[in-house]
Amino acid sequence: MEKNIKALWKNFQLKLEKIKHYRKLYEQQIKEYKKKITGLNNETDANEISRIKNEIEILNRLIKIKNTKDNVIKKDFDEKNVFEIRNFNFWYNKNKQVLFDINLDIKRNKITALIGKSGCGKSTFIRCLNKLNDLNENTRWTGDIYFLGKNINSGIINDLTLRTSVGMVFQKLTPFNFSIFENIAYGIRAHGIHNKNAINEIVRQALISAALWDEVKDNLHRNANTLSGGQQQRLCIARAIALQPDVLLMDEPTSALDSIATNSIELLIQQLKEKFTIVIVTHSMAQTIRITDETIFFADGRVIEQGTTKQIFTKPKQKATNSYISGKN
């Protein structure tokens, strides 16, 4: 892996020099814009001020690209991890900070639970891992997220590649209003695979992996919305794993399901960890204990404690962790 990282860094040197050059230009342009705004009238020049502020926002987004050696390729990245997060902060609406100085590792082929009260930052954090939050306007961040040794915010890995490698299953059941088959085949074609036999096999394998094939193999052209809740969630999982991601993110995947469907999904998640690293947001302490290997406790946008699930629930090191898992807070 060390040789691969060195090769990646060498190939990226020229690109970095270009980034540094353009970053200086962007920063200079922002200074000029800010000087111009100070000379404008808020009432009579409102449209021009708005235009300039939009330009500044665009330039600030471009400046997000990092320009130093250490935060593009992490040479000391631990091969036991898939993610290493360092000094990460995140804001909505530019000034509403919701994540504070996050430092943690997510281990390969483990099921890691993110726990904590509603609004503590769990769902925001999990969406940072494949940059879904970047699809929203007026967000910003500082710090570094390394995926398999590469900084996802450096430009070395594009967003489409990242989201293919880091799949997502949402809390709300989200099957497309297509057939069962097309729910999976649609994304396969979008990634440039058009051979009919290849698509058929990928769909079949995804449904098998999601423990759904035997239930739907004779009705693949049935509308996905006619499936039960548990079947719909397994279809969403099949869709997420069809292109063989490294990581599967799950944001409360069983919160909308009954106990029988929940048991089915939990069993599936445990089976999937043989192939994928899984990160799951959950409010269920019982579920965390049943199926996860690692647990990270969030409170008020901060990581309070990280450890094995057994350690967190039997010998928590922090009083806040103990209060939460015991139901006192």
Curated annotation (Swiss-Prot):
EC number: 7.3.2.1
Compartment annotation: Cell membrane
Keyword Hydrolase: no
Keyword annotations: ATP-binding, Cell membrane, Membrane, Nucleotide-binding, Phosphate transport, Translocase, Transport
CDD domains found in the cross-reference section: ABC_PstB_phosphate_transporter (cd03260)
Bilayer disposition of the protein: Peripheral membrane protein
PROSITE patterns: ABC_TRANSPORTER_1, ABC_TRANSPORTER_2, PSTB
Broadest EC class assigned to this enzyme: translocase
GO cellular component: plasma membrane
Reaction(s) the record says it catalyses: phosphate(out) + ATP + H2O = ADP + 2 phosphate(in) + H(+)
Location of the ABC transporter domain: 83-325
Positions annotated to bind ATP: 116-123
Matches recorded under Gene3D superfamilies: P-loop containing nucleotide triphosphate hydrolases
One record GO biological process: phosphate ion transmembrane transport
GO molecular function: ATP binding; ATP hydrolysis activity; ATPase-coupled phosphate ion transmembrane transporter activity
NCBIfam families: 3a0107s01c2
Family from the record: Belongs to the ABC transporter superfamily. Phosphate importer (TC 3.A.1.7) family.
Primary role: Part of the ABC transporter complex PstSACB involved in phosphate import. Responsible for energy coupling to the transport system.
Subunit structure: The complex is composed of two ATP-binding proteins (PstB), two transmembrane proteins (PstC and PstA) and a solute-binding protein (PstS).
UniProt protein name: Phosphate import ATP-binding protein PstB
Gene: pstB
